[in-house]
Amino acid sequence: MASFKIVIVCLALLVAVACARRRDMMSDDELDYHYSKRGIPCACDSDGPDIRSASLSGIVWMGSCPSGWKKCKSYYSIVADCCNQ
């Protein structure tokens, strides 16, 4: 029974290694596109005061906004910022 478990574990490892895909490197333009498509949308000050009708043009970034992005909310938060390009 122990040898059967060893065979199953070896097969599982073989499948895991065979199915692992190498991640391709992306250019900065592609990274900017993917960064803008991820995250949680947020309402910038320019979207208006009503959150229900706002277009949610910003994206929540943990910490602070990355280079090329600007903070679009007037309040200060230590944890995250609402940023847009």
Curated annotation (Swiss-Prot):
Disulfide linkage: C42-C82, C44-C72, C65-C83
Propeptide span(s): 21-36
Gene Ontology cellular component terms for the protein in this record: extracellular region
GO MF, one annotated term: toxin activity
Subcellular location: Secreted
Keywords, ordered alphabetically: Cleavage on pair of basic residues, Disulfide bond, Ion channel impairing toxin, Neurotoxin, Secreted, Signal, Toxin, Voltage-gated sodium channel impairing toxin
Main location: secreted
Tissue expression: Expressed in ectodermal glands and in clumps outside of the extodermal layer. Is not expressed in nematocytes. In adult female tissues, shows similar expression levels in mesenteries (gametes-producing tissue), tentacles, pharynx and physa.
Signal peptide bounds: 1-20
Spans traversing the lipid bilayer: none
Family assignment from sequence similarity: Belongs to the sea anemone sodium channel inhibitory toxin family. Type II subfamily.
Note: Nv1 toxin seems to be encoded by 8 different genes. 4 of them code for identical precursors, whereas 4 others code for very similar precursors. In the genome draft, 6 additional loci are also correlated to Nv1 toxin, but they are not predicted to be functional genes. This high similarity may be explained by concerted evolution. The primary structure of the mature peptide is identical in 9 entries (AC B1NWS4, AC B1NWS1, AC B1NWR6, AC P0CH90, AC P0CH46, AC B1NWS8, AC A7SCE5, AC B1NWR7 and AC P0CH45). Additional information can be found in entry AC B1NWS4.
Function: Binds to site 3 of voltage-gated sodium channels and inhibits the inactivation process. Is highly active on DmNav1/TipE (drosophila) and is only extremely weakly active on rat Nav1.4-beta-1/SCN4A-SCN1B, and on human Nav1.5-beta-1/SCN5A-beta-1. This reveals high specificity for arthropod over mammalian channels. In vivo, when released into the medium, this recombinant toxin induces impaired swimming, paralysis and death of the crustacean A.nauplii within several hours. Also causes paralysis of cherry shrimps immediately after injection at very low doses.
Name by which UniProt lists this protein: N.vectensis toxin 1 6
Organism: Nematostella vectensis (Starlet sea anemone)
